[in-house]
Each structure stands twice: as structure tokens, then as C-alpha cells.
């Protein structure tokens, strides 16, 4: 084996034992983060609700509802799962790195490590973008379709369900988080010589079209959310 590889060649059984150890550490780290997140699930969900609460300030009659006995419980489970996964990602990524690093050349380590660091940071940036810039615009737009009961018309009021609200929020956070990973993907493709800068320029029109198609699929059917996702892509 090349001298740049730090460790000597390991037998297959040793690799399997090491893989099992890293998987156990990853699962243990996730479970700790999951149960900690479940303890704070109500606070996390209230944080996700804040952009909606901001447009209803001063109206104590506003509420979100659940219509099944188990809905709120499983919503808290989902909150804990999403939050636990995000918090545990550095632990899991570190275990992956410990497992694969001994088999990499030094130059491969130097090339790979920045992507491992940039991936969670860019995903967090995407989530922060949708929370602080998209939600404050999209939620008032959706709420504007309410209708007051007057002149014989029925009142139409927005009362979101907790499960549906969480699903929408997490879908948008996931979509924007992935869209912010595009620099990592493009850089990896360029380093692997799958794509070059000239080919990217030639296919720019198709990429723009694909960005808007992806935004239409991943976001609610309103132009504000779709444009908000397509632009970062």
C-alpha cells in the first residue's frame, strides 16, 4: 500500500468490527439527541410556529388544532426526530470520518474534509434563509385568503393542523437546505471531472429550467415560495 495511507491494510473482519463500532456510536449519539429533543419538543415546535404567530399578534382567538387523539404526540415525535437528526449530524459525520479516514491518502483527506465541514453549515444556512426570509412572506400570503362573514357570506378562517404545519415547514426547510448544498455538489462534480466550467455554462438554461421545476415540486403552489427556492438553486 502507498506510504501516504496512514494505516496498514486491515483484514475484512477488522473492518466489519470497526464498522459495527462506528454504527453503534452513531446510533447512541442519535438516541441521546432524539430524547433530548423530545424533552424540548414543545419549545422547538413553538419556535417553528413563531413566523405564523407573528402575523396573528394581538389576536388571542387564533389557534392551531389537532383532530386525532394521537396527532400531537406523533407530531412531537417527528419534531424530536428532525431536531435529533440535525443535532446528531456532527457526531454521525465524525464517526463516518473516523471509519473512512485511515483508508484515504493524505491529499484525499485534505480534499474531502472541507466538504464534510461545509455540508452541515450550508444546510443550516438554507434552513435559516427559509425561516427568516421565506416564512415571513409566504405565511401572510396564505393567510390573506381568509374571508370574513359579511353580507351573507360564510366566514373562512385559517386553523392549521399541527401535523400538516410541521410537514410543510420541514419540507421547506429540507428543500432549501438541499438547494444550498448545490455548491458542494458542483465542486465535487468538477473535481471528479464529470462536469467542467464550460459545460456548466453551456447547460445553464437547462439548469435554470430544472431549478424552477424542482422548486415547483418541493414547495407549496405559490409563486413566492417557488421563486424563493429557485433563486438559491
Per-range role (PLM):
Residues 1-233:
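Membrane topogenic/interface segments and analogous intrinsically disordered interaction regions
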